[in-house]
Swiss-Prot record:
Additional observations: Present with 25900 molecules/cell in log phase SD medium.
GO biological process: branched-chain amino acid biosynthetic process; branched-chain amino acid catabolic process; isoleucine biosynthetic process; L-leucine biosynthetic process; L-methionine salvage from methylthioadenosine; L-valine biosynthetic process
Pathway membership, UniProt: Amino-acid biosynthesis; L-isoleucine biosynthesis; L-isoleucine from 2-oxobutanoate: step 4/4; Amino-acid biosynthesis; L-leucine biosynthesis; L-leucine from 3-methyl-2-oxobutanoate: step 4/4; Amino-acid biosynthesis; L-valine biosynthesis; L-valine from pyruvate: step 4/4; Amino-acid biosynthesis; L-methionine biosynthesis via salvage pathway; L-methionine from S-methyl-5-thio-alpha-D-ribose 1-phosphate: step 6/6
Organism: Saccharomyces cerevisiae (strain ATCC 204508 / S288c) (Baker's yeast)
Taxonomy of the source species: Eukaryota, Fungi, Dikarya, Ascomycota, Saccharomycotina
Entry's family note: Belongs to the class-IV pyridoxal-phosphate-dependent aminotransferase family.
Function noted in UniProt: Cytoplasmic isozyme of branched-chain-amino-acid aminotransferase, which catalyzes the first reaction in the catabolism of the essential branched chain amino acids (BCAAs) leucine, isoleucine, and valine. Catalyzes the formation of methionine from 2-keto-4-methylthiobutyrate (KMTB) in the methionine salvage pathway primarily using BCAAs (leucine, isoleucine, and valine) as well as lysine and proline as the amino donors. Involved in cell cycle regulation.
Cofactor: pyridoxal 5'-phosphate
Protein's UniProt name: Branched-chain-amino-acid aminotransferase, cytosolic
Gene name linked to the record: BAT2
Amino acid sequence: MTLAPLDASKVKITTTQHASKPKPNSELVFGKSFTDHMLTAEWTAEKGWGTPEIKPYQNLSLDPSAVVFHYAFELFEGMKAYRTVDNKITMFRPDMNMKRMNKSAQRICLPTFDPEELITLIGKLIQQDKCLVPEGKGYSLYIRPTLIGTTAGLGVSTPDRALLYVICCPVGPYYKTGFKAVRLEATDYATRAWPGGCGDKKLGANYAPCVLPQLQAASRGYQQNLWLFGPNNNITEVGTMNAFFVFKDSKTGKKELVTAPLDGTILEGVTRDSILNLAKERLEPSEWTISERYFTIGEVTERSKNGELLEAFGSGTAAIVSPIKEIGWKGEQINIPLLPGEQTGPLAKEVAQWINGIQYGETEHGNWSRVVTDLN
């Protein structure tokens, strides 16, 4: 028997009877308010994907023994839609999110889907709530696709039932008053990811264990953890973001933008990939090297002492870039330069402008922006 694929053409739409009015931009807080509708699609091992539904935002009803609650059969994505300067609504590189979502699903034995079908369905969901997509630079619609195992029973095995759902949240800028550089605690006593694990997948199970180390770092005055790994204390990620550092060779004067390689312990960030692509295109090759390589907290410390550490920042969907001003390590502070009178370094500022320009339709870059609807 052939299992039914996820099919956007079969979507059933039920419109809310209680449409919301858009909140003022000043009231938009990440993850606190949601649009009027949600997308759901059930899957069974016997039949495959059922009819997708767009319906009023509502609670889910699950058996208390559902495997998602007991064995963490759960994964998610984070992506955004933007209202552009020419009054269109676009999604930013959704194909990358769908590819990563399928990889996550395969890793924990949940069903996969045709990426284009889910992109189409998410587009239909956004169209249903298009009036709630906020307008203005820094404002966007955060999209949270989620896939959970819903099999009822306490046995640990491959789920034979699953639920795909998507909810959306109008959000404002990560930094409401401009960049705010953060202090990090280099963390070697807790591990975010390890070889053979699933640190490169967007599983909920990767996030909860990182909260306690973050609280511990916060108690010492740091905003986030700089995750280290292995006997050499390789730098991996910062908080829930990919990490970038900028070094300068004191002999040649050439600068290097470096981030950790995708070795299975690093999340394949969409923003990370975008930064690497744009840096290779737009930075002068005679002045810059773009590297994906291992580097350690020891190297950062040494290059800071030699005046070769120019900048550092995290990257992710929520903030695009998060400038770093200080790293605490073994009782010492590594100070990272910022632009005079600003809370960012020069490259982080430039990178944010590059990506914002594409997201808000000021510049084009291949097929990175996928039009959902034209509001003109």
